[in-house]
């Protein structure tokens, strides 16, 4: 809970500062990149959370990974976090920043699940389907062979399930219902 509160405050401050200085989109791209690096490298997360590793070593690691590749505001945040011994929450801050950025910009996350990677045309069609529910959408693509075919779209608490497995389950339920009623 404490990490969530800390992440919220740092992310909010960074969003406000970046927006005030006209670099919000650049900092958003940086935070998405940082989030991706931390998601892909569990050893990096472990090092950042390890209290035995010195703060200057953690700063050197972050500098080597992101120095010269991210905006000055982003690098300043990373430096501040190591000085304040908050480097353990870098991943949480980047995730929270992404959430707050999407909220500020009116972007909704739409999760699309298919059995194989989707094409650009399909991506455009999915965005068009969801355009009536949100003006800006960000597609998160997932592969799940258990749905057998078709797709499942999820946004907030809404779901459009056009998968083969869902249709088979509907047929099975109707058949079972008819057998019971017979």
UniProtKB/Swiss-Prot annotation:
Keywords annotated in UniProt: ATP synthesis, Cell inner membrane, Cell membrane, CF(1), Hydrogen ion transport, Ion transport, Membrane, Transport
Disulfide bridge positions per record: none
Its membrane topology: Peripheral membrane protein
Keyword Transport set for record: yes
Gene Ontology MF terms: proton-transporting ATP synthase activity, rotational mechanism
Localization in the cell: Cell inner membrane
Cellular component, GO annotation: plasma membrane; proton-transporting ATP synthase complex
Cross-referenced SUPFAM superfamilies: N-terminal domain of the delta subunit of the F1F0-ATP synthase
Pfam families associated with the record: OSCP
Domain of life: Bacteria
Role summary: F(1)F(0) ATP synthase produces ATP from ADP in the presence of a proton or sodium gradient. F-type ATPases consist of two structural domains, F(1) containing the extramembraneous catalytic core and F(0) containing the membrane proton channel, linked together by a central stalk and a peripheral stalk. During catalysis, ATP synthesis in the catalytic domain of F(1) is coupled via a rotary mechanism of the central stalk subunits to proton translocation. This protein is part of the stalk that links CF(0) to CF(1). It either transmits conformational changes from CF(0) to CF(1) or is implicated in proton conduction.
Subunit structure as annotated in this protein's UniProt entry: F-type ATPases have 2 components, F(1) - the catalytic core - and F(0) - the membrane proton channel. F(1) has five subunits: alpha(3), beta(3), gamma(1), delta(1), epsilon(1). F(0) has three main subunits: a(1), b(2) and c(10-14). The alpha and beta chains form an alternating ring which encloses part of the gamma chain. F(1) is attached to F(0) by a central stalk formed by the gamma and epsilon chains, while a peripheral stalk is formed by the delta and b chains.
Cited HAMAP family: ATP_synth_delta_bact
Family that this chain belongs to: Belongs to the ATPase delta chain family.
Name assigned to this protein: ATP synthase subunit delta
Originating gene: atpH
């Amino acid at each position: 809970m404490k990490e969530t509160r800390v992440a919220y405050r740092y992310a909010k401050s960074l969003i406000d500062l970046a927006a005030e200085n006209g670099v919000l989109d650049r900092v958003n791209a940086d935070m998405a990149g940082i989030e991706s690096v931390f998601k892909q490298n569990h050893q990096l997360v472990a090092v950042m959370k390890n209290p035995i590793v010195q703060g200057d070593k953690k700063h050197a690691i972050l500098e080597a990974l992101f120095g010269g590749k991210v905006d000055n505001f982003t690098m300043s945040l990373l430096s501040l976090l190591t000085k304040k011994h908050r480097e353990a929450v870098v991943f949480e801050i980047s995730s929270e920043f992404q959430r707050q950025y999407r909220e500020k910009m009116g972007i909704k996350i739409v999760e699309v699940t298919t059995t194989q990677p989707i094409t650009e045309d399909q991506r455009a069609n999915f965005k068009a389907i969801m355009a009536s529910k949100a003006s800006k959408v960000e597609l998160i693509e997932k592969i799940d062979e258990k749905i057998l075919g078709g797709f499942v779209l999820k946004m907030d608490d809404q779901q459009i399930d056009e998968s083969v497995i869902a249709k088979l389950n509907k047929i099975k339920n109707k058949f079972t219902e008819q057998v019971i009623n017979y």
